[in-house]
């Protein structure tokens, strides 16, 4: 276990990139039992292995601040105002990279271990839906691995569900209607 008194995380994401910026770290999706447990500031930011902050609002996309973990990057500007941090090119690249890595990991689990994703979906759904609403690029990627659950508890990818309902739920303009 990562923490002795905590439940196993749903899954990990390893970060390691040297170009166009330098970044290492590990992020993980915690298991959420109820809404009271959702807390931010669980990602610690380091610069050259020196603790900087656990407020990573500008570095980690808003919908991913619910993740836990550690990020280390010598390319984060220090001793600057928040407005400068927001406009720093490396910070924007790091944010985009983290979003892509999360989407890639979820897609990998969907393709290779779909049963595992279905078992964990109720815990992940909150993160993924929030991300789809707040980040267009993440939404485009998430359309591949996002799951829908029917009343019988069976999971469908959006594409599978569309194929299932297409014959019965197509309007006169030939568009599928999701109910």
Model regions and ranges:
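Conserved GHKL (Bergerat-fold) ATPase module
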Residues: 1-178
């Amino acid at each position: 276990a990562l923490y002795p008194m905590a439940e196993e995380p749903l899954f990990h994401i390893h970060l390691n990139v040297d170009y166009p910026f330098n970044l290492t770290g590990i992020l993980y999706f915690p298991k959420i039992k109820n809404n009271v447990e959702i807390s931010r500031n669980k990602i610690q930011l380091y610069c050259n292995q020196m603790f900087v902050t656990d407020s990573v609002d500008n570095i980690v996309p808003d919908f991913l601040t619910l993740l836990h973990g550690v990020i280390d990057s010598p390319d984060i500007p220090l001793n600057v105002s928040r407005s400068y941090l927001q406009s720093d090119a490396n910070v924007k690249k790091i944010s985009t990279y983290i979003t892509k890595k999360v989407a890639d990991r979820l897609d990998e689990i969907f393709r290779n271990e779909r049963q595992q994703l279905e078992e964990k979906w109720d815990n992940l759904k909150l993160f993924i839906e929030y991300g789809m609403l707040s980040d267009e690029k993440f939404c485009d990627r998430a359309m591949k691995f996002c799951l829908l659950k029917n009343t019988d508890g069976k999971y469908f990818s959006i594409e599978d569900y569309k194929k299932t309902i297409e014959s019965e739920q197509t309007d006169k303009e030939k568009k599928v209607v999701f109910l």
